[in-house]
């Protein structure tokens, strides 16, 4: 231990302050000197600016030391032992956050402690001599923080100061410390302290003092902080950085320089005198309510202060892991300056920061190679930046310094940093400050720092120590920009439009293996750096409001708020605005681009979706906005409009009321945008109105035409009645007499048709009317004559299947019994005026199963017949000449019947088997007609026995035209499409050998005779508009109530598999169902026979459409049944209900 006598102590004291007679007794406090003289061992005292070299020493006990730099402040954790105990033994005095009395900030050559606590002497910094009787002036605004590597005067040290030297020259890395013991266990016992020494201490040292940490509550029994989740610590750290400190009590205190501090012992009074203190004292947060207070500190060492004194080192801020998230942490100490609510107050215009180049930020990893959460990082500009309303930017004077405070919260204990080359071990952390140009961010602006002698030197990065789970506060002061911005001069008292700006960048970087990696960085708003006095630029009367170039006008540069001090637009008014004129908006086409016409239909839809409501504003909002709360309003809701028209709604940030209530993300509506939507909607309504007017005009014209036609009909009826009741001489009288009574009517009609009545004479009109009446009378007489002639012709000729059957000319007798399978008929070949003779076979169903007579009808088509009496042939040939299809001579079937299909039921259908017969002609020209021999074979499809089924949900699609019988479909108003399919196969044919079905008339009971029988009123083939009427009925009782059989001729050129549609109409709603499809011949094509019918569905309504197909047979028959609504059934049991059967027999004309 170095022994210093009293004389040398006095010499050191006075040399350190250079007073030389300038000191007065009232300005000197010699209490510290007197205490040193009176005490035997004053090893716990620390003198400023000791000129003689001293040996290094380290404190190995658990008591924290006084911070060596005013800018780095740490708070020791409560209950967890001393702060250095978390990271092993304390580092030597050159520690980056030094725990001794020097202020070398890691830049002094302080080596590690040697064994025994001694080491080489540290060279003192030479002091600049001062003139006798004078004191050095304080630097500008001496209340600022002076935290930067202390400027060393040695040239070789100045040349070698780099971030690398900061890491290795200053302090040994804290990453090399052993892991700390658990917080709930006491730290290792402190070893005996080595002999202390007093290194060099700078004169003008300004430090910020923190109050002593109070005794906090002890941890709960058995509660281990390491077992708690890591995210709670992260939330606490983030809460610390964002903590609003408005509720903390503040007490203003006077700023004092270190040279004015009275010498005293190292207690709280002496520390408050030596250390510069910001306005407001530090207040600890209240204790946790569930903790019982107990002393958290370990046994005090030799240098530990008493219970009422202040520790020499206020350690870093630590968030207790046991503290629940969201509540104030008992381990946090906040000063009312840095964490006060002044920075959060929107009225306080402080410079804002935002992250800078986040894509270049590196990631930290712990010793287990696990990625650590992102550290919390916040930057505050405490001093030096003033907001200029005229320039709308922050202004910094180059000769005045600024100050920056950084809060860094480290989550976890980092050991490695992730680089493009992989993980690298960390050496140290440091802060780097520099400026950039707004127009060129790659151009860097150097930052300078003023010294105590008012000299400026380049600012070097600041080495910081970041313990885990703590927040470190670093304050860097007395900073200056090395240059000013360009174009600072005003033009005519207004801001220069070519003004250039700087931005300040504060970055936290990590050093690893001679490389620097950015961990976090923030960049400030635009800054104007001026070299002149701000009084030359700022003027409260000229800059804010001044006269403009136009007479009687006032100019203001910036935003204007009326009844509000936070305008976010050019003009914000809280209250009503009365405008006697108009509001103008720019609308010149020359100032617009991408002009596109809108769809007014969509605008009408959007307007129709908007909801108008009546409402009143809440009283707290009305008071803040300056409007009346009781006045009812009508308008829209912004949230609803945002869903319909997002561009009409804008977010204006948080709305704070006078009572403190806040509406986050307050929404406002652009009513001008909604007005334009209304314009488009009105245009669309105009279009609809024009269309309606056009249609109304058309309807009016049609109504006028119908009125004219009705008047003409009335005139015609009057003329025809006069023609039939009077003689020819009375026609003129009937036409002239009413003329005298109708001049106004004729005049009104002529005025509507012809504008000039003089152009048409009265005599011309009379003649025209008489001529019309005569022509009408002649037409009526002609129509009557033709009708009488047609009735007589129909009596002579009987219409059968589109041709006339001449019963008197052809012999239809000789129907004698023949063997089963054929019949014989003779027809004379006479020279009548008939065309091609056609032999057809029309079976007559009887009740006898064994004997089935056949009727051979000789039908001819007249070469010349009366108009309207000819039967139309179904001819659907699209190309001429049409090839003859399915007209080959019929083949003789084998005597044995075919095999029955699997779906065949022989008890349902019986097709007649005609008996073989011969056809003899007359004596002159008698020809034996060919006999068709069909033995017990009748091809057909039947659904007899299949009951009524409900509607199926899954309907099969229609078959392709290649299928012989595509899906049948009946169309009605309330009937779905129905279908049945099947590609014909030879083996799938169904044979009908049972007795014939009895008709409904035979099976009905007497009680049903009085009930109305459902029937069809009209039948038509839609494809060629061919109506099927009674002309297609066969002679006899083929068409009678309850059973209608139509014989429809098909031309030989009609292609096979042609799909047609039967349109069946009824006067009342009925049900129609397809019961069977039959044919008695062999098919014309192999493999073209339809399969068995599936279950059919009836169609209901008054209009029914059923698809049918021209099959590959010469003859085939469709059987439909019409019944009451919902009672259609093809089974024999359904015959007791009123029903009507319709048979459509198609046959080819192959002559």
From Swiss-Prot:
Regions of this protein lying in the Lumenal compartment: 790-1151
InterPro entries: MRF-like, MYRF_C2, MYRF_ICA, NDT80_DNA-bd_dom, NDT80_DNA-bd_dom_sf, p53-like_TF_DNA-bd_sf, S74_ICA
Annotated phenotype, changing residue 695 to H: In CUGS; uncertain significance
Family matches, as Pfam families: MRF_C2, MYRF_ICA, NDT80_PhoG, Peptidase_S74
Effect on the protein upon substituting residue 530 to A: Decreased affinity for DNA
Family recorded in the similarity comment: Belongs to the MRF family.
Disorder cited: Encephalitis/encephalopathy, mild, with reversible myelin vacuolization: An autosomal dominant disease characterized by episodes of acute encephalitis associated with impaired consciousness, delirious behavior, seizures, and reversible splenial lesions observed on diffusion magnetic resonance imaging. Most patients completely recover and there are no neurologic sequelae. MMERV occurs in children and is frequently associated with a trigger, such as a febrile illness.
Protein's name according to its UniProt entry: Myelin regulatory factor
């Amino acid at each position: 231990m170095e022994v210093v006598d009293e004389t040398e102590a006095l010499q050191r004291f006075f040399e350190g302050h250079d007073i030389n007679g300038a000191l007065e007794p009232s300005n000197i406090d010699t209490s510290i000197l007197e205490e040193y003289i009176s005490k035997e061992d004053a090893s716990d005292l620390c003198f400023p600016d000791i000129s003689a070299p001293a040996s290094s020493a380290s404190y190995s006990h658990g008591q924290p030391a006084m911070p060596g730099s005013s800018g780095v402040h740490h708070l020791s954790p409560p209950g967890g032992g001393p702060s250095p105990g978390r990271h092993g033994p304390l580092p030597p005095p050159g520690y980056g956050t030094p725990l001794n009395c020097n202020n070398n900030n890691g830049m002094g050559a302080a080596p590690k402690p040697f064994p025994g606590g001694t080491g080489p002497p540290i060279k003192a910094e030479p002091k600049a001599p001062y003139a006798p009787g004078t004191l050095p002036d304080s630097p500008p605004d001496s209340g600022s923080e002076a935290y930067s590597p202390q400027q060393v005067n040695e040239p070789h040290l100045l040349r070698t100061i780099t971030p690398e030297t900061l890491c290795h020259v200053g302090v040994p890395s804290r990453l090399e410390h052993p892991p700390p013991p658990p917080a709930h266990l006491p730290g290792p016992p402190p070893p005996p302290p080595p002999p202390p020494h007093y290194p060099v201490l700078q004169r003008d040292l300004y430090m910020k003092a923190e109050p002593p940490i109070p005794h906090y509550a002890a941890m709960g029994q058995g509660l281990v902080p390491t077992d708690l989740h890591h995210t709670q610590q992260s939330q606490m750290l983030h809460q610390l950085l964002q903590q609003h400190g408005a509720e903390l009590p503040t007490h203003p205190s006077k700023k004092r320089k270190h040279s004015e501090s009275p010498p005293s012992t190292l207690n709280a009074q002496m520390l408050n005198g030596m250390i510069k203190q910001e306005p407001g004292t530090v207040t600890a947060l209240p204790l946790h309510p569930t903790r019982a207070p107990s002393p958290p500190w370990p046994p005090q060492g030799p240098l530990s202060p008493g219970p009422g004194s202040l520790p020499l080192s206020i350690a870093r801020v630590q968030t207790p892991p046991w503290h629940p998230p969201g509540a104030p942490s008992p381990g946090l100490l906040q000063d009312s300056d840095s964490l006060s609510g002044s920075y959060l107050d929107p009225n306080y215009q402080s410079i804002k920061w935002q992250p800078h180049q986040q894509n270049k930020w590196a990631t930290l990893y712990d010793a287990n190679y696990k990625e650590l959460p992102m550290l919390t990082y916040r930057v505050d500009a405490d001093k030096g930046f003033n907001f200029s309303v005229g320039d709308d930017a922050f202004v910094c004077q180059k000769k005045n310094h600024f100050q920056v405070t950084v809060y860094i919260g480290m989550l976890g204990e980092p050991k490695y940093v992730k680089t493009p080359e992989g993980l690298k071990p960390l050496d140290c952390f440091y802060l780097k400050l520099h400026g950039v140009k707004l127009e060129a961010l790659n151009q860097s602006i150097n930052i300078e720092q003023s010294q105590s002698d008012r000299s400026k030197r380049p600012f070097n990065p600041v080495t910081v120590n970041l313990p885990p789970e703590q927040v470190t506060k670093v304050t860097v002061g007395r900073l200056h920009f090395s240059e000013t911005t360009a174009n600072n001069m005003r033009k005519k008292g207004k801001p220069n439009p070519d003004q250039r700006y700087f931005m300040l960048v504060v970055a936290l970087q990590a050093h690893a293996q001679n490389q620097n990696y950015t961990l976090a960085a923030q960049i400030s708003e635009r800054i104007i750096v001026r070299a002149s006095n701000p009084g030359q630029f700022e003027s409260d009367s000229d800059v804010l409001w001044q006269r403009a170039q136009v007479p009687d006008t006032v100019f203001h540069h910036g935003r204007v708020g009326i009844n509000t001090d936070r305008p976010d637009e050019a003009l914000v008014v809280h209250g009503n605005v009365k405008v006697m004129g108009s509001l103008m908006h720019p609308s010149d086409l020359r100032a617009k681009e991408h002009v596109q016409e809108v769809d007014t239909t969509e605008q009408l839809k959007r307007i129709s979706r908007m909801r108008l409501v009546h409402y009143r504003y809440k009283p707290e909002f009305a008071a803040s906005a300056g409007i009346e709360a009781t006045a009812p309003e009508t308008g829209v809701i912004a949230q609803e409009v945002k869903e319909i028209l997002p561009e009409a709604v804008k977010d204006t940030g948080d709305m704070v009321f006078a009572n403190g209530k806040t509406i986050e993300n307050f929404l406002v509506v652009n009513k001008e945008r909604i007005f334009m939507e209304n314009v488009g909607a009105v245009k669309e309504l105009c279009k609809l109105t024009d269309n309606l007017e056009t249609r109304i005009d058309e309807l009016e014209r049609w109504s006028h035409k119908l009125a004219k036609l009705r008047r003409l009909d009335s005139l015609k009826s009057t003329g025809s009645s006069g023609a039939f009741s009077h003689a020819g001489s009375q026609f003129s009288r009937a036409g002239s007499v009413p003329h005298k009574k109708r001049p106004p009517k004729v005049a009104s009609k002529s005025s509507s048709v012809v504008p000039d009545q003089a152009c048409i004479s009265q005599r011309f009109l009379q003649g025209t009317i008489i001529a019309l009446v005569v022509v009408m009378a002649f037409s009526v007489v002609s129509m009557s004559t033709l009708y009488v002639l047609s009735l007589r012709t129909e009596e002579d000729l009987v219409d059968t299947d589109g041709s006339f059957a001449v019963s008197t000319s052809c012999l239809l007798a000789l129907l004698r019994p023949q063997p089963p399978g054929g019949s014989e008929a003779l027809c004379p070949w006479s020279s009548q005026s008939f065309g091609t003779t056609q032999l057809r076979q029309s079976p007559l169903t009887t009740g006898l199963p064994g004997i089935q007579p056949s009727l051979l009808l000789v039908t001819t088509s007249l070469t010349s017949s009366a108009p309207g009496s000819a039967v139309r042939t179904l001819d659907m040939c699209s190309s001429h000449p049409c090839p003859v299809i399915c007209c080959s001579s019929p083949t003789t079937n084998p005597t044995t019947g075919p095999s029955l299909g699997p779906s065949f039921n022989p008890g349902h259908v019986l097709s007649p088997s005609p008996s073989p017969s011969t056809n003899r002609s007359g004596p002159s020209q008698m020809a034996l007609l060919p006999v068709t021999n069909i033995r017990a074979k009748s091809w057909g499809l039947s659904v007899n026995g299949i009951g009524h089924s409900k509607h199926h949900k899954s309907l099969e699609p229609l078959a392709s035209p290649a299928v012989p019988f595509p899906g049948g479909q009946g169309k009605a108003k309330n009937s779905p499409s129905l279908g049945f399919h099947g590609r014909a196969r030879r083996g799938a044919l169904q044979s009908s050998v049972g007795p014939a079905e009895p008709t409904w008339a035979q099976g009905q009971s007497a009680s049903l005779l009085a009930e109305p029988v459902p029937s069809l009123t009209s039948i038509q083939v839609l494809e060629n508009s061919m109506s099927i009427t009674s002309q297609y009925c066969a002679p006899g009782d083929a068409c009678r109530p309850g059973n209608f059989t139509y014989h429809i001729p098909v031309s030989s050129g009609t292609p096979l598999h042609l799909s047609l549609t039967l349109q069946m109409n009824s006067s009342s709603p009925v049900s129609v169902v397809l019961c069977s499809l039959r044919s008695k011949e062999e098919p014309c094509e192999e493999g073209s026979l339809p399969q068995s019918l599936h279950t059919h569905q009836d169609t209901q309504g008054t209009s029914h459409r059923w698809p049918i197909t021209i099959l590959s047979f010469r003859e085939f028959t469709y059987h439909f049944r019409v019944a009451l609504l919902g009672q259609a059934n093809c089974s024999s049991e359904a015959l007791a209900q009123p029903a009507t059967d319709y048979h459509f027999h198609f046959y080819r004309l192959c002559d």
